A protein has these predicted regions:
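Amphipathic alpha-helical dimerization/coiled-coil segments
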Residues: 82-126
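Generic recognition of well-ordered alpha-helical segments
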Residues: 30, 75, 90-93
Length: 126
């Protein structure tokens, strides 16, 4: 199952990938495609943006007679990755709280009551 991902989340994934080891574009895209349905036409502008911001640097290396462009994280990129990791944790915790709250309230029958109240309030506005 794929969930929609924002450009910011893709940036976070890219920085996380190149933090582990220098990687080339296709390799990065294949790793991200394990969890998100993205196209190279989406990925490369984000890589360029990260390079322009100073979060990654690039270098070329030959592999089986062909040149590959590798991306390497910078210290600024590590700082940005840590920031995005904090944002991701906060986002994930919020989603988990909503899901857990819903489960608990379903067990207690509260969600059903809240749903009815919301429907009634919506009907009154019409």
């Amino acid at each position: 199952m794929y969930f929609p991902v924002s450009a910011l989340l893709i940036e976070f994934m890219i920085l996380s990938i190149v933090n582990r080891e220098d990687s080339y574009g296709y390799e990065i895209s294949q790793t991200i495609k394990l969890v998100a349905d993205i196209k190279e036409s989406t990925l490369y502008p984000i890589l360029k943006k990260l390079e322009k911001a100073g979060y990654v640097t690039t270098y070329s290396a030959e592999y089986q007679g062909r040149k590959r462009k590798y991306y390497s994280i910078t210290e600024a990129g590590k700082t940005q990755m840590a920031y995005l990791q904090g944002e991701w944790k906060s986002y994930r915790d919020t989603i988990d709280d909503i899901i857990e709250w819903r489960k608990k309230n379903d067990e207690w029958g509260i969600s059903e009551t809240i749903g009815k109240v919301s429907e009634e309030a919506s009907a009154e506005r019409l």
